[in-house]
Amino acid sequence: ISSVVSSINIDEMEELVHQVIDEEHIKVQIFGFKRFVPSNELKETGALGKEGLEKLYNKLEKLNKKYVDKTKIVSDMPMKNIFQKKRVYEIMDKYNLDCVGCSAGINGISIRNDGTVTPCTLLYISCGNILNESLEEILNNDIMQKIKKRELSGKCGGCKYKMICGGCRACAYQLSGNPLAEDPECFI
């Protein structure tokens, strides 16, 4: 089960898990909670903000402890790596990874129906078109390279955890217009 968490429904997370697992006794291997990425008219009403993102992290931790024997609670929040940094660094060493956290342009890309390639399904910035360019050319695009090398600005640029977190590039772009800007909802 996957659910997007916004400021509108953050207080319903626990009830959702309780209803599915405890009340309906449905066996769910993974319960995924995705952070809402503000865009367009929902920028004001759905955004979590710093306090909301911290609240989301705390709720995820609480749910993980409560349901540890019944389901796995996961999230795509890059900041979570900071709280498990020892384990994350061990994984990075084991698999020879330069960075983890936000996967935009690093662990994945998005190819839209018209061939437009973006660093992430939620980061609506074109880095090329697969119908006109090779994938290698697109992956060597300036934006893709800066994201991959974590050449970020603001708080994320100076953060000692940028290689294990990197903030959410889609959120940075949606709220500032710059995919390399700091994640404005970071609570660290």
PLM regions with names:
Residues I1-D114, T118, L122, S126-C127:
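Radical SAM enzyme [4Fe-4S]-AdoMet core and its adjacent flexible, acidic
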Residues T116-V117, T121-I188:
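Flexible mid-to-C-terminal extensions adjoining Fe-S/redox cofactors in radical SAM and related proteins
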